[in-house]
Amino acid sequence: MSQAGDVEGPSTGDPVLSPQHNCELLQNMEGASSMPGLSPDGPGASSGPGVRAGSRRKIPRKEALRGGSSRAAGAAEVRPGVLELLAVVQSRGSMLAPGLHMQLPSVPTQGRALTSKRLQVSLCDILDDSCPRKLCSRSAGLPERALACRERLAGVEEVSCLRPREARDGGMSSPGCDRRSPTLSKEEPPGRPLTSSPDPVPVRVRKKWRRQGAHSECEEGAGDFLWLDQSPRGDNLLSVGDPPQVADLESLGGPCRPPSPKDTGSGPGEPGGSGAGCASGTEKFGYLPATGDGPQPGSPCGPVGFPVPSGGESLSSAAQAPPQSAALCLGASAQASAEQQEAVCVVRTGSDEGQAPAQDQEELEAKAQPASRGRLEQGLAAPADTCASSREPLGGLSSSLDTEASRACSGPFMEQRRSKGTKNLKKGPVPCAQDRGTDRSSDNSHQDRPEEPSPGGCPRLEEVKIPHGVKLVCYLGSGPVIQLLGAISHGQAGGQLPPKLEVLEDLMEVSSPSPAQRLRRKKRPMVQGPAGCQVFQPSPSGGTAGDPGGLSDPFYPPRSGSLALGDPSSDPACSQSGPMEAEEDSLPEQPEDSAQLQQEKPSLYIGVRGTVVRSMQEVLWTRLRELPDPVLSEEVVEGIAAGIEAALWDLTQGTNGRYKTKYRSLLFNLRDPRNLDLFLKVVHGDVTPYDLVRMSSMQLAPQELARWRDQEEKRGLNIIEQQQKEPCRLPASKMTHKGEVEIQRDMDQTLTLEDLVGPQMFMDCSPQALPIASEDTTGQHDHHFLDPNCHICKDWEPSNELLGSFEAAKSCGDNIFQKALSQTPMPAPEMPKTRELSPTEPQDRVPPSGLHVPAAPTKALPCLPPWEGVLDMFSIKRFRARAQLVSGHSCRLVQALPTVIRSAGCIPSNIVWDLLASICPAKAKDVCVVRLCPHGARDTQNCRLLYSYLNDRQRHGLASVEHMGMVLLPLPAFQPLPTRLRPLGGPGLWALPVSPLLSPGLEVTHSSLLLAVLLPKEGLPDTAGSSPWLGKVQKMVSFNSKVEKRYYQPDDRRPNVPLKGTPPPGGAWQQSQGRGSIAPRGISAWQRPPRGRGRLWPEPENWQHPGRGQWPPEPGLRQSQHPYSVAPAGHGFGRGQHFHRDSCPHQALLRHLESLATMSHQLQALLCPQTKSSIPRPLQRLSSALAAPEPPGPARDSSLGPTDEAGSECPFPRKA
């Protein structure tokens, strides 16, 4: 709008009544008829010089007074009802809708004086009620904000509100911020009587009124100025008073805040006032008004900050009460444009460091749509102050508010606001922006003039055309956080119901719980405005941008449901004359997002914990009703359940997996009918909830289950103890490449003892240490093998006396059986005791305690090991080892071993037993088994590598040794010696006495061993002469009768026994020298004649029995049919069996008792050297053979049969 100029100049105020204000008020009231739209239709409606509403022409004070007088004189021309309406409007400070063109009828001239007089009386009454001491407070007798300050503080000048450029040039701040009130002109005298001017003065006064109403005063407000506020009935917009001490949030969206009893002053920020609340802090605000509802009868203005959709054509920021006169009930246009209905005013929050840029205002101006008579004027974009009040016309008081005055108020005030910061905000925000009206006159020349943006211009209202389907969203921006307030409902835009804000989900929340778990939002308290509009009531305490409920929160977000802004027609408070008092007990401020998340976080556990309490209560109450006499009530049970859940929560600190697992365990045990003890303890309080949730599953279990567990545990321990006490009869197991393999034990297997470290074996060859035989064991010949005390077994050995000279040259220990017979046997009374074992023990097992160990000699002579050397096997590092005899009585093969033994490959285990079975019985005496004992730690490690290599592959190693075969056998721990190697005799694995710590039924076991089986070959060197084992007491071998089997055949194969007194044909008899016994030559296979090339007696190729034919010609049965040959491995070799034939010495002796007695005398005579000539021929040959020298060379074993003439061995029987 254009303005002729600003009248500036200081003036002093009357302490009782400000003449300046009084004059202005009268001029403005009387000049109401000169407003566009309020002027009468008749040509003589107004007198005096015609002055446009938007004219900037300066009118002298006197001329204004004359205009007021002429106006009063011509008041008769105005209808009395209109003048009364103007008086009421002037007294109450109400403001009509912007652009409301009232077609007033002609009023008679004689009525104007009466109207002017009534206006003066009303103003005097209002101003007289206020006293000088209530400059900054409300008068109890006057309406809120309808106060006219009667005196001005001393020393305070009155200045006019300057335009922005004048303010910048002059360095003056806003009148509302520098504690100076606007005045009409510098030319005005201090005192001015209340006179009326009919013609030009009202226009000038109205323009001054407009500038003065566009300004505001800060919180201290020293000067008295005129506010547009409401009357005692709440519908007047003219008020003179002090600014409020507390700025309310509703001042941002429109000054519709009813005063609170706590308020100390009135200002335009309150409901009904024409000025918007000014915050001198750091905030800049706009607002997003929604579409207003239709105009109600008597109320041309819509709700706060919303365009009137029907009839109302301006964006109103202050709700107006319906006029008290019917003259104001004028119709307006039927529909408002879509631009007005969907106009949006953006709310922005700023800081005190900067101001809104000027281009924002220009953009808002560009968006504003030109309006016709019923619309906003084109270019209507006045920068709002910090509180961004809306443009609201003064109705019948003025045609429009000056835009320049608005900018003048906005610019300097922003500078003052930046200087003060948040200090004034804490004192109480002061409203400083007043509502501005729009000029509805036909002269719109001010529209062509571009508006000059103020330095601190705030966002301005604009009309924005919203496409279909797009919602108007209200939001609050505070730094990086954007808080959604809601969307304006379009369904209610054109109806009679007030618009609503629909709740929108805030997507900026860190974690948004589900709708069922989201806390319910509480509605903000509503304050009813004078025109029926509802505004949000913020918290009484102001705040900055981050403080909810302060000035930075124009529309606190509705949290649940849609919040209606107001309905003027349906609200009964609209008809009340007094202002509405806001409720003092406002809701607490809503926390920020972080605080809200902390409040919503415990709600996540409410469902789980509530379910636990209910389930626990149901279980306890159900179990309690099962008792015959329940003693607890349901409330007590509920308390117990709640206590258990609280203790469980305290233990786990959350509804995690541990919480749920413990809850299920408690619920299961309390529900179990067998666990009555636990339930009674919980109900009677013997077990507190604290102890209950900390009990283990074993403690929660019923007693019956606990006893069963104890019994099972004791049973398992007993089984383990029994297994440890019983003899080691269980099958042993070993680890193979296929896993753990169980090895069944043989019933005739004897477990032996062995020293784990492999000590040296001590032996004594002295004959003094040998015990003397005490009894004869001939009757037990069926149960033993080669017993020296048995006469039957003794007949096999040649007499040492007879062969004394021969044994002197040769080794007497070549034959293991001959050495065994040459020694005195162990006492036989121990034998029956070993067979009287318990049935559980194998009958052929002789425990170590039952064996008779020879008494240790007083001076034991240690013997060197039979062999020491190095083994180099399978690309494994060589290791040093020594041999320790395990089985066998001959050390010839052991001593013949080379110093370095190298590997020759691997063979399966069954091949070893085949090789052992194929050995000739004559050479079986040299078979022995030794243990390889490494020397040091490194040698032990390499030996274990070789053992693991063979054991994992279930193979036996084969060594390359001359004159003998050497097989390496891995023997796992706790495994006895193979049964096929035990008949060889020897010390065995047992070398030390049984430990006293062990029970008699248990035997000492051994670790993993590496054994070597030595098998003889042809051309074995004779090293037995130096054997240290000569004269050693051998181990007696006994067999069970169940295992040993005898086969007796008929007498068809018995040899031809010569008649008594005649020698046997072919020298078939041999006489024993030492014992005087005679046995057939071909009977004993183990009897060894003296070495020689010739035979004692000529023997036919085929030895025929009389009348019986020849021996079986089958070569395959030659060995098995030999009278004293060792049985095959499948029958007797592996088990030590001996098959007795029909030519057994025992049978032969029984048949020839008579011949033996006769020949005994003859043999005695032959032994005498004097009777050598009388010796028969066979005996002479025997003597010559004994006297013949032995040729050099290795001795040949002739145990398999007689030799032929050439000295070659002749096996018998021979095939014809």
From Swiss-Prot:
Keywords: Chromosome, Differentiation, Nucleus, RNA-mediated gene silencing, Spermatogenesis. Residues 177-190, 436-452, 832-844, 1046-1055 have a biased composition (Basic and acidic residues). Residues 36-50, 314-325 have a biased composition (Low complexity). Gene3D superfamilies: Transcription elongation factor S-II, central domain (1.10.472.30). Pfam families: SPOC, TFIIS_M. The keyword Nucleotide-binding does not apply. Residues 867-970 form the SPOC domain. Coiled coil: none annotated. One of its GO terms (biological process) is DNA-templated transcription. InterPro entries: SPOC_C, TFIIS_cen_dom, TFIIS_cen_dom_sf. Residues 1-74, 166-216, 236-325, 348-462, 511-601, 823-850, 1046-1140, 1176-1216 are annotated as: Disordered. It is linked to Spermatogenic failure. A male infertility disorder caused by spermatogenesis defects that result in non-obstructive azoospermia. The disease is caused by variants affecting the gene represented in this entry. PANTHER family: SPOC DOMAIN-CONTAINING PROTEIN 1, TRANSCRIPTION FACTOR S-II ZINC FINGER DOMAIN-CONTAINING PROTEIN. This is SPOC domain-containing protein 1. It comes from Homo sapiens.
